[in-house]
């Protein structure tokens, strides 16, 4: 068997009849499967042991040879080879057909390959193949044309008229004759000439035909192989037949389909031997053709063949297609051994790198390790008795288990795994009970809660896998979120509430007492002299003088209070206690700790202390937070929800105003639309007033207020609904109902108010489930389009980059600073201080936060950085163009699968995006798509709803109106002008006399990215897509780094469309990879020919995924049969560069530690090294 790691590429093509016979171990002649009495396979049937191998290991059919010593002998009685039974998964058979039949993929696919190469319409071809018409194969010297169709009557007439002077036939035989006669080289030449000379539909048709002809020419496939003479029979264990209890059999649908083919084939042979009348033979041939069609792709033509209960049978094509097909079910995702799942509960006592594993589960997962150790330690004599000990759970087993799991990490995974933080490694700690315990701080990454969530455990087995889990995947090493580089293990909920309560001061500002040392203050607190929240003054100590300042010991000394050492500070007892658990480098934070501050602390810790210490630091804050959340006794009682006193007054005022508006409307002073808008505005304002009085009246130590202000749970709008008023509600279509809900939940709603608010609730629930599905599908497409983007080299040497400029509004306020766009990126050129002339950042140096600050301080408004959009690496990107790896904060390593990370970073927050489409109200009823559908629209490069008109050249605008139609004319400086007519109801964004640039929007709406590509070129459309996607995410408060979106945009713009092939081998109208296009042109120019001309194309992510070089990746994505048909005809070779292809064939992925450059590193465990060392000493 060929080792999977030793081949570089995999090729697919058409199989010739000889090839199929070569694969086969014998012909299946009978439709029988197994004998109903003996339950052994019938000879020459679909499960025949002589063809496919024995059903039991080392045993022939008749039982003459049993046992392994007869290995390889072929039994002289029954003809079965004595070998392993698993050959029944590998050996194929074949069926010799009495008449050739066509392969439905090549005849029925769109476009029909057979029809194109013969230049016959698919409908005419269908008539011939299914015996409804004759086709002339050789007109001889008659006036008939080759490939002319004749009806039954016409055929008879011409036969009587011309006798045997012409040849005509029907069915696949006739088509085969035509296919064998084709001269591909000559056809290719004629078609190339035709493409150059004709235009319109004929040109398109010729181009399509040329593509198919070229495919056959280059691949070495023969066109007549599209007609089958022999049919391969797949191995029986891949279409099994199993006995159910009750003596009935369950069988794979393929057996039924094969059986029909064999029955019809045998009947046809018999009829031919008998010399039956032509009409009967013809009918039988047609039925054979239909049976083979059903076997290959049931339901592609006509009604599908159904089994019991009217269920269509699953054909060979269905076995590959869809989520349950071979690709997605068995090749891309397999079930694995050494895994288990259980409910999760919180483990607040755990360290960040630990998880609690139930004893029983651990024993089962680590069984082989435990058994080996039991034998090695002499507790058991052999593996069998060790196994018995484990099964009986003897006491010594538990001690051995403790030893085995020490230092052996396990992987925990929670479905759905939306990003790479959904699988992390932990050191197991054995716990009683049957629930897995997880650390509270990793819940954010897993998006886990404890309302019954389950998680799966996997055990990495090999030394390499363990090393990877420990070094790369340990939870304590995954502190930053790859999507934005922010810490993902920030303490929240109870921990945050505890820290907030602890650091919250009393409203009075005078210090209650003064202390000479923190310990003294602590003593006073413990003796009840001061409270946690009292303002006090404390003098903080300094680290001992004998320690060298800024040395490791100096920093680690508990008396080092950093910024406040040796000073007297006004603070609270609680804040002092909080700072005590902080590392000296982070002190002293004299603030009330809420969500933002907590994030800042973790961020500072990561930058100043590194990974390991940050993990320790978060654990300390976690413990402190839990302790004081408990101590605070913060609960919600109904008395904590206080309704503001002047609510009634505000409502009365609002009602008065609404009455006034209604009166104005009845008098005809305002339109209904204005009345509606006014009423909505009045109630919104009333609600805001209630909210602001509510905020003023709430006390600092009110638990509801503490939860909200700390950011632990709830927001101001929820509290307004509890204690203020619920306000306006939307109806099912999203329109706001002008009747507000005046009550709050504390007072209780009336029946009508309750009913009004149910609309919104239902919409919310429906939206959530729809959103989850859509978001998952979007992620799948993103992963597919970018899965082969891997960091392949250090520097691609490009001279291009993208320039970010600070954006300011007309008053000089900065709308968009450049800092977020340039941090973590590599500078293209030296960045020089405009006044002093010193170089702040050298070319090819990464810009970190400090350098970005310096750039900002120097007043530099424009920076050019390296970007993946301009990267010149062929099958991926280079380190310099990608910049910082956000999960580590350092420059990305070669081998990082940045495409997948980008897809996850965009897809994971997708569930948070809304589904709603906004209503602008009034006449302009064009909904502006927002939220998730907008992201999808952008990535799929669709024509947007509510499309804006864009300027096609730079120039001055003039707006004219005639007969109620508005027109915008743009006149450029050289006198050229373009006029656009504005559709009714569109809102114009420009004024007469204004100067616009090409690509600017003239009316409101979304721009069609294809138009933008035409007008502004690559750079313009890249900018636009990046901006628009960011806009949607920013609206929801989701922060995603530019580089992730850039990777997607780069993949969408990888192809060019050939306009004129010149002297190249490229096909006109074909899509080619930019790099292949450049190579081909370079080759032609070197030979002195005319290069090809092409224009860049923007493909949606689905199209781009299917247009990849890898047919395995494309076939496993969507439209499996179409992709495989195309690949087979072209004889495509898959270079196995991406991740999916390698997973499918079972190789290590070419990313991370699976890259070629890391292949020859071998890992040793300490014991191995120690043993070798001892051996060396003995020698």
Curated annotation (Swiss-Prot):
Binding site for Zn(2+) 1: 60, 62, 75, 78
Residues where Mg(2+) binds: 449, 451, 453
GO BP term, pick one: DNA-templated transcription
GO molecular function, one term: magnesium ion binding
Lineage: superkingdom: Bacteria
Binding site for Zn(2+) 2: 796, 871, 878, 881
SMART domains xref list: RPOLA_N (SM00663)
Coiled coil residues, start to end: none
Enzyme Commission code: 2.7.7.6
Gene3D superfamilies for the chain: 1.10.132.30, 1.10.150.390, 1.10.1790.20, 1.10.40.90, 2.40.40.20, 2.40.50.100, RNA polymerase II, clamp domain, RNA polymerase Rpb1, domain 3
Enzyme class name: transferase
Keyword Transcription on entry: yes
Cofactor: Mg(2+); Zn(2+)
Keywords, comma-separated and alphabetical: DNA-directed RNA polymerase, Magnesium, Metal-binding, Nucleotidyltransferase, Transcription, Transferase, Zinc
GO cellular component: DNA-directed RNA polymerase complex
Keyword Glycoprotein applies: no
HAMAP family: RNApol_bact_RpoC (MF_01322)
Subunit structure of this chain's protein: The RNAP catalytic core consists of 2 alpha, 1 beta, 1 beta' and 1 omega subunit. When a sigma factor is associated with the core the holoenzyme is formed, which can initiate transcription.
Function: DNA-dependent RNA polymerase catalyzes the transcription of DNA into RNA using the four ribonucleoside triphosphates as substrates.
Family per similarity comment: Belongs to the RNA polymerase beta' chain family.
Protein name (database record): DNA-directed RNA polymerase subunit beta'
């Amino acid at each position: 068997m060929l080792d999977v790691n030793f081949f570089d590429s995999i090729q697919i093509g058409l199989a010739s009849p000889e090839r199929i016979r070569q694969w086969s171990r014998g012909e299946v002649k009978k439709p029988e499967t197994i004998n109903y009495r003996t339950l052994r396979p019938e000879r020459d049937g679909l499960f025949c042991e002589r063809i496919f191998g024995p059903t039991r290991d080392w045993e022939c059919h008749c039982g003459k040879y049993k046992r392994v010593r007869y290995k390889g002998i072929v039994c002289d009685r029954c003809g079965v080879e004595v070998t392993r039974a698993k050959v029944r998964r590998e050996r194929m058979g074949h069926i010799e057909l009495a008449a050739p039949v066509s392969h439905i993929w090549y005849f029925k696919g769109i476009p029909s390959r057979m029809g194109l190469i013969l230049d016959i319409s698919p409908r005419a071809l269908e008539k011939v193949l299914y015996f409804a018409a004759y086709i002339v194969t050789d007109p001889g010297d008659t006036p008939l044309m080759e490939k002319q169709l004749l009806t039954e009557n016409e055929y008879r007439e011409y036969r009587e008229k011309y006798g045997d002077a012409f040849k005509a036939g029907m069915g696949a035989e006739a088509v085969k004759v035509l296919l064998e006669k084709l001269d591909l080289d000559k056809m290719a030449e004629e078609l190339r000439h035709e493409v150059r000379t004709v235009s319109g539909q004929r040109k398109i048709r010729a181009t399509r035909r040329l593509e198919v002809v070229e495919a056959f020419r280059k691949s070495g496939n023969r066109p007549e192989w599209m007609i089958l003479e022999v049919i391969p029979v797949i191995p029986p264990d891949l279409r099994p037949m199993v006995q159910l209890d009750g003596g009935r059999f369950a069988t794979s649908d393929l057996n039924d389909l094969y059986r029909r083919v064999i029955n019809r084939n045998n009947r046809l042979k018999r009829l031919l031997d008998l010399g039956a009348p032509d009409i009967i033979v013809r009918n039988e041939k047609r039925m054979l053709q239909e049976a083979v069609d059903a076997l290959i792709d049931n339901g592609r033509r006509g009604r599908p063949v159904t089994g019991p209960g009217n269920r269509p049978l699953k054909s060979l094509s269905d076995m590959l297609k869809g989520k349950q097909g071979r690709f997605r079910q068995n090749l891309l995702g397999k079930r694995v051994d050494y895994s288990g799942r259980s409910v999760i509960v919180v483990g607040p006592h755990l360290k960040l790198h630990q998880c609690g594993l139930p004893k029983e589960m651990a024993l089962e997962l680590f069984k082989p390790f435990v058994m080996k150790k039991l034998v090695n330690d002499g507790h058991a004599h052999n593996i069998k008795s060790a196994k018995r000990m484990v099964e009986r759970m003897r006491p010594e087993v538990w001690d051995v288990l403790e030893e085995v799991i020490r230092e052996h990490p396990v992987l925990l995974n929670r479905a759905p795994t939306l990003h790479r933080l959904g699988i992390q490694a932990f050191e197991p700690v054995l716990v009683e009970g049957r629930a897995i315990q997880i650390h509270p701080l990793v819940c954010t990454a897993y998006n886990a809660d404890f309302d019954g969530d389950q998680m799966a455990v996997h055990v990495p087995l090999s030394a390499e896998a363990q090393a990877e889990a420990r070094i790369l995947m340990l939870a304590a090493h995954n502190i930053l979120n790859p999507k934005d580089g922010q810490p993902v293990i920030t303490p929240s909920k109870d921990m945050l509430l505890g820290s907030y309560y602890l650091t919250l001061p009393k409203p009075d500002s005078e210090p209650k007492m003064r202390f000479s040392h923190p310990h003294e203050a602590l003593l006073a607190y413990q003796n009840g002299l001061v409270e946690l929240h009292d303002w006090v003054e404390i003098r903080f100590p300094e680290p001992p003088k004998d320690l060298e300042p800024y040395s490791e010991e100096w920093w680690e000394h508990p008396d080092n209070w950093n910024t406040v050492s040796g000073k007297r500070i006004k603070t609270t007892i609680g804040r002092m206690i909080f700072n005590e658990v902080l590392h000296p480098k982070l002190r002293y934070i004299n603030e009330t700790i809420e969500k933002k501050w907590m994030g800042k602390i973790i961020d500072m810790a990561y930058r100043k202390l590194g990974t390991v210490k940050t993990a320790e630091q978060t654990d300390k804050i976690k413990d402190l937070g839990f302790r004081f959340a408990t101590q605070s006794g913060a609960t919600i009682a109904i008395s904590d929800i206080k309704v503001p006193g002047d609510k009634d007054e505000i409502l009365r005022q609002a009602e008065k105003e609404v009455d006034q508006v209604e009166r104005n409307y009845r008098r005809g002073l305002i339109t209904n639309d204005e009345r509606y808008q006014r009423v909505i505005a009045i109630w919104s304002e009333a609600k805001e007033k209630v909210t602001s009085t509510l905020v003023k009246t709430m006390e600092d130590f009110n638990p509801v207020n503490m939860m909200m202000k700390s950011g632990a749970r709830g927001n101001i709008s929820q509290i307004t609904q509890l204690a203020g008023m619920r306000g306006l509600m939307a109806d099912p279509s999203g329109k706001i109902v002008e009747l507000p809900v005046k009550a709050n939940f504390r007072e209780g709603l009336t029946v009508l108010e309750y009913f009004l608010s149910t609309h919104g609730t239902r919409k919310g629930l429906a939206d959530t489930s729809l959103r989850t599905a859509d978001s998952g599908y979007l992620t799948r497409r993103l992963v597919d389009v970018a899965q082969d983007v891997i960091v392949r080299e250090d520097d691609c040497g490009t001279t291009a980059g993208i320039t970010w400029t600070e954006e300011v509004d007309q008053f000089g306020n900065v709308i968009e600073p450049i800092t977020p766009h340039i941090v973590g990126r590599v500078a293209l050129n030296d960045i020089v201080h405009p006044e002093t002339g010193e170089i702040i950042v050298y070319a090819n140096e990464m810009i970190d936060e400090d350098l970005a600050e310096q750039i900002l301080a120097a007043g530099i408004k424009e920076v050019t950085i390296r970007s993946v959009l301009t990267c010149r690496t062929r099958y991926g990107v280079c380190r310099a163009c990608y910049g910082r790896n956000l999960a580590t904060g350092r420059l990305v390593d070669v081998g990082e699968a940045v495409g997948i990370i980008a897809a996850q970073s965009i897809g994971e927050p997708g569930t948070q995006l809304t589904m709603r489409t906004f209503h602008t109200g009034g006449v302009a009823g064009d909904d502006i798509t927002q939220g998730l559908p907008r992201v999808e629209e952008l990535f799929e490069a669709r024509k947007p709803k509510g499309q804006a008109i864009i300027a096609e050249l730079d120039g001055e605008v003039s707006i004219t109106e005639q007969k109620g139609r508005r027109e915008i004319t743009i006149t450029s400086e050289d006198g050229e002008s373009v006029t656009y007519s504005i559709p009714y109801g569109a809102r114009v964004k420009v004024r007469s006399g204004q100067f616009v640039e090409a690509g600017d929007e003239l009316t409101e709406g979304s721009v069609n990215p294809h138009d933008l590509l035409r007008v502004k070129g690559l750079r313009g459309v890249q900018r636009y897509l990046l901006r628009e996607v960011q806009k949607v995410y920013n609206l929801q408060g989701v922060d995603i780094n530019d580089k992730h979106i850039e990777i997607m945009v780069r993949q969408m713009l990888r192809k060019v469309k050939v306009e004129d092939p010149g002297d190249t081998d490229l096909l006109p109208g074909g899509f080619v990879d930019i790099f292949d296009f450049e190579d081909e042109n370079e080759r032609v120019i070197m030979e002195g020919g005319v290069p090809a001309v092409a224009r860049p194309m923007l493909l949606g992510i689905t199209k781009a995924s299917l247009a990849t070089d890898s047919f395995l990746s494309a076939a496993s994505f969507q439209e499996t049969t179409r992709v495989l048909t195309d690949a087979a005809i072209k004889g495509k070779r898959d270079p196995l560069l991406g991740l999916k292809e390698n997973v499918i064939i079972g190789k290590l992925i070419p990313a991370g530690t699976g890259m070629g450059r890391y292949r020859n590193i071998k890992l040793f465990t300490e014991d191995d090294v120690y043993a070798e060392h001892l051996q060396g000493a003995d020698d």
